[in-house]
């Protein structure tokens, strides 16, 4: 299946009011959630779909209390850009796994916290 770069592109625009911004945020959120199974198979993520959806929700909840309309518009533009990059397979699996620190396949502690810990582990 060939990838069309403009398939997921959306024209940047400003929200007219808060109800318009809310509608656009919910539409973007639904797009992310609906594409979760496809993301899991494209990137061969070793995580269940429920964990991926929970992480998407956490990203949206992080910006829940933004109270300036221009800031919401910028966040929407960034969200659409991230969605396009993700669905066009312009990221690597490591980029996707960086969103899941606790489930990361690299491990939580890549480097020892002190010299003696590294020495005892045989890393130095």
From Swiss-Prot:
It is a peripheral membrane protein. Its main location: mitochondrion. This is NADH-ubiquinone oxidoreductase 14.8 kDa subunit. The gene is nuo14.8. It is found in: Mitochondrion inner membrane. It comes from Neurospora crassa (strain ATCC 24698 / 74-OR23-1A / CBS 708.71 / DSM 1257 / FGSC 987). Accessory subunit of the mitochondrial membrane respiratory chain NADH dehydrogenase (Complex I), that is believed to be not involved in catalysis. Complex I functions in the transfer of electrons from NADH to the respiratory chain. The immediate electron acceptor for the enzyme is believed to be ubiquinone. The precise function of this subunit is unknown but believed to be important. The keyword Transport applies. Belongs to the complex I LYR family. It comes from the Eukaryota. GO terms for cellular component: mitochondrial inner membrane; respiratory chain complex I. Keywords: Electron transport, Membrane, Mitochondrion, Mitochondrion inner membrane, Respiratory chain, Transport. Complex I is composed of about 40 different subunits. Belongs to the peripheral arm of the complex, most likely the globular part. InterPro entries: Complex1_LYR_NDUFA6_LYRM6, NADH_Ub_cplx-1_asu_su-6.
């Amino acid at each position: 299946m060939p990838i069309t770069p403009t398939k997921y592109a959306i024209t940047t625009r400003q929200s007219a009011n808060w109800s318009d911004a809310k509608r656009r945020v919910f539409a973007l959120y639904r797009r992310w959630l609906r594409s979760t199974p496809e993301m899991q198979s494209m990137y061969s993520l070793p995580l269940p779909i429920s964990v991926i959806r929970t992480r998407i929700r956490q990203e949206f909840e992080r910006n829940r209390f933004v109270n300036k309309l221009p800031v919401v518009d910028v966040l929407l533009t960034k969200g659409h850009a991230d969605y396009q990059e993700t669905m066009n397979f312009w990221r690597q699996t490591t980029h996707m796994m960086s969103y899941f620190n606790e489930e990361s396949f690299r491990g939580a502690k890549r480097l020892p916290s002190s010299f003696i810990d590294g020495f005892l582990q045989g890393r130095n």
